[in-house]
């Protein structure tokens, strides 16, 4: 096994440019769905959070070639807040990268929150989110340059015509100005879309040739909890997914 950085090291150089890191030190809190503290550390240390749950061959092989390297020219401009147009291939790469990070994040909990074996196998073979997963992107223009939350077994109420209750792997990533929401339900369900003025679906692909980021509306500090809790019911206890 090797050390896999939850937030890849190439991101740190970009985040160092963010002026929101200047001034008084901030503490990054990584929490689960019940608000239980997973990790607490300054942004300068966030990049060093690692898990030893990834094999060396995967970490230095397909994860690097198929996800990390292709994702850098896609996500890098978004972290900086620059306009970015994503074609379908880029949408799929970014969605796959986000799903990979969500799965890795589950293992930094104490105790670790195991990810379903079939999801891990799917990522290995396809480097894309599992078929029943959803990934959305947004733009965050708050005071905090980084925010991460992760939970395996979150209770979700999904608008699929009638509301459908499921349990899911869930994660939120705020990296600079880029915001990503990942939701992996345990059962196949078609989720009706939230308003596209602030949130854009990456996965499953919408069929649009290109999508433009950022969307018309930004997420600020006041709206961030709404994005974090999108479709989730924090009042319900989680349950193991594996």
Segment roles from a protein language model:
Residues 31-32, 79-83, 123:
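Short alpha-helical interface elements
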């Amino acid at each position: 096994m090797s050390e896999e950085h939850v937030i890849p090291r190439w991101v740190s150089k970009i985040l160092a440019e963010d002026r929101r890191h200047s001034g008084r030190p901030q503490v990054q809190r990584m929490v689960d769905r019940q608000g239980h503290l997973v990790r607490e550390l300054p942004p300068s240390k966030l990049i060093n959070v690692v898990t030893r749950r990834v094999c060396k061959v995967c970490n230095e092989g397909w994860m690097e070639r198929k996800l990390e390297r292709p994702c850098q020219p896609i996500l890098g401009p978004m972290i900086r807040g620059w306009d970015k147009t994503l074609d379908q291939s880029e949408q799929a790469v970014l969605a796959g990268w986000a799903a990979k990070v969500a799965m890795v994040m589950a293992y930094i909990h104490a105790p670790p929150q195991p990810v379903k074996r079939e999801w891990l196998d799917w990522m290995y073979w396809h480097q894309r989110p599992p078929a029943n997963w959803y990934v959305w992107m947004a733009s965050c223009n708050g005071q905090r340059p980084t925010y991460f939350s992760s939970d395996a077994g979150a209770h979700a109420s999904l608008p699929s015509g009638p509301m459908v209750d499921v349990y899911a792997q869930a994660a939120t990533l705020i990296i600079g100005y880029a915001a990503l929401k990942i939701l992996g339900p345990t059962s196949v369900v078609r989720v009706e879309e939230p308003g596209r003025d602030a949130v854009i679906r990456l996965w499953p692909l919408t069929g649009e040739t290109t999508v433009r980021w950022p969307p018309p509306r930004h997420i600020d500090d006041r709206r961030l909890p709404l994005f974090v809790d999108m479709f989730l019911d924090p009042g319900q206890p989680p349950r193991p997914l594996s």
